[in-house]
Amino acid sequence: MATLRSFVLVDNGGTGDVTVVPVSNANGVAEWLSNNSRSQAYRVTASYRASGADKRKYTIKLEVPKIVTQVVNGVELPVSAWKAYASIDLTIPIFAATDDVTVISKSLAGLFKVGNPIADAISSQSGFYA
């Protein structure tokens, strides 16, 4: 069983990294937040459910805020202008070995690796072209 612990969500090489810390584990849903106020925080939730007798289902959700500065009475305050949302449902057969699941985890990381088509489309706010 995975332990709830802090982890680096956005790795910027040590400068401006975003670390999220566990804040809740209620009703089977684990939640992590960055150190900002809730409205300005990066947020990750993850849950695990049995899906039939032979499958495990993981649901991972991510919120990424766009932080801007707003001036109120001459004081600059950080506020969230908007948030981007992601949701991933992952269903794994119960008989998958540790090596199989490691490959699945690496595949998920590879989907969004800089330079891959999915990451490029997201970065350029475009679709997919031949």
Swiss-Prot record:
Which organism's genome codes for this protein?
A: Enterobacteria phage JP34
> Has the keyword Nucleus been applied to this entry?
no
Instruction: State what protein this is by name.
Output: Capsid protein
Q: Which BP terms does GO give this entry? A: regulation of translation
Subcellular localization: Virion
Quaternary structure and interacting proteins, as annotated: Homodimer. The capsid proteins form dimers that assemble by group of 5. Twelve such pentamers are linked together with free dimers. The homodimers binds to the viral RNA via an operator hairpin, but also to many other RNA sequences in the viral genome; this interaction probably shifts the virus from the replicative to the assembly phase and ensures specific encapsidation of the viral genome.
Gene3D superfamilies membership: MS2 Viral Coat Protein
**SUPFAM superfamilies membership:** RNA bacteriophage capsid protein
